Amino acid sequence: MKKKFYTLLLLTLFFTSISIASSDFSIEEVSRDLIVFSQNGQQGLIVINENNSIVVDPMNQETTKNIQNFLASNGKPMISRIIYSHSHWDRISTGKTTLNKDIAVIAQQECSLYLSTNNKDVLGPTIYFQDYFEITDGRKKIDLYYYGPSHGECMIVIHLVEENLLFIPDLLHTKGASFPRDATLPYLRPSTLINFFNELEKLVQKKKIKSFIGGHKEDKLIGSTSIIAEQKIFWELMQKTAEQAEIDGIINLDNFIDLEQLDLQPYQQYDNYDSEDLINIIRRYTSFLNMGR
């Protein structure tokens, strides 16, 4: 894989004003037609076809301009479609003047609650789908799957069929099962999370998918899909711990667990372990068990 870093000083192509691009914009070529771009710690995809390019999660206006400049300066076709992997604005705020008005924007139906009129910088989807959507363009085929609320209400996984590679925007780390990036878990949906992982495992087995790319920049660009089962075990452990803690009476009135009453060894094996994070995660699960939220 080839890695290229671009410090873009003047972006005059396709834009009405001169912009200065951030020096941390980078691309990494997975294959001739599949490129991972990253900026500010987040990652998305560019899928290049003969006559057009498809972008997954263009992040923001600056990143979108960097992508367009990269395509133009390398003789690549310009963007014709955008796929939103979920509704969080830090991944989809392109600005409405940056892109051609004829661009198709694809998102899962549940995203509509957040994308209707809430953010003027988010280009509204032109296509919504429920559980599955297929994009076929020339020899390229991209499958979009929705397995219910997981990281927010509408996160999807994307199967790049030619490469037999998954793009999973959140909930997984390419280096292995881990504590979450944000232990306050503002977007986690415990009621349907395990079902999400179950369905993801079925997809991987059915399609014989061995590798995935995540939505956050990490030391390893590509991870093994065996991590899916390992991460599911982590979340099952969190729920079982919360359930047992309630039975044992070691949860106080504010839903905080007494860690001194807990054997920490099963949790310390996971990357990014932090005792305070463990307390917050268990609190999230006890809140779910007690209130259904």
Regions found by a protein language model. Give the residues of each.
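Bacterial N-terminal signal peptides that target proteins for export
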Residues: 1-9
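Boundary at the C-terminal end of the N-terminal hydrophobic targeting segment
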Residues: 19-23
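Accessory terminal helices/loops
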Residues: 204-211, 218-293
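Conserved beta-strand hairpin/beta-sheet module of binuclear metal-dependent hydrolase folds
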Residues: 25-69, 157-170
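Bacterial N-terminal signal peptides
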Residues: 8-17
